[in-house]
Amino acid sequence: MSKVDLIIQSGSTILYPIVEEGISLSWDRKGSPGKLKFSVVKDSVLSFQEGDAVKLSVDGTDMFYGFVFTKSRSGRAPNVIEVTASDQLRYFKNKDTYVYSNKKASDVIKMIAEDFGLSVGALEDTGYVIASRTEDNATLFDIAQNALDETLRAKTKLYVLYDKVGKLTLQDIESMKLNLLIDADTIG
């Protein structure tokens, strides 16, 4: 059986809540933040707010780092708090206007991260330089994806932007392949 640790940091206080009914973690390949949903039992110690940090680890491996975006009480059990946390790609739903020239898609993503104070991990150099581009009142997802789409058309290389446990990461999809075969024998 796997050892699952869920931690909420509220200010300088580290909380280990009692989780009810399991945890749901989901990711999409593009255009959506990672999402962690869970329910916790409210006790005399548990006190946290929207914006507090959440970390999920399984068997000692960090799987998710994000922030509480919604919390609500269930009508069926008033002492249970239903929580949805999202990784920092949630901020890529913000809209902004960017005018840039002579930048690679990796540079555009780094520029957005710096402007919005987001943590950056490994951003693979996308190589292709975009001559100029204007993005008017577009989501940060669209701005980043448009730069990645131009790179795909020019270099035929597909890059994936994701949040790797609290760090924006950009990686060539070819380097993400696993030596894994799923067939009738492996799934049971």
Identify the residue ranges that each predicted region occupies.
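Short beta-strand-centered interaction patches in the first periplasmic/extracellular domains
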Residues: 78-81, 87-89, 124-188
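Short acidic/His/Gly/Ser-rich catalytic and metal-binding motifs that mark active-site loops
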Residues: 91-94, 121-123
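Generic alpha-helical secondary structure
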Residues: 102-109, 140-144
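Second-shell loop/turn segments in exported
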Residues: 94-102, 131-134
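Short intrinsically disordered coil segments
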Residues: 54-56, 98-103, 183-188
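Assembly/oligomerization scaffold segments
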Residues: 1-91
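Glycine-rich, acidic and aromatic/proline-enriched surface loops and short helix-turn segments
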Residues: 104-121
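Alpha-helix C-terminal capping segments
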Residues: 57-58, 113, 161
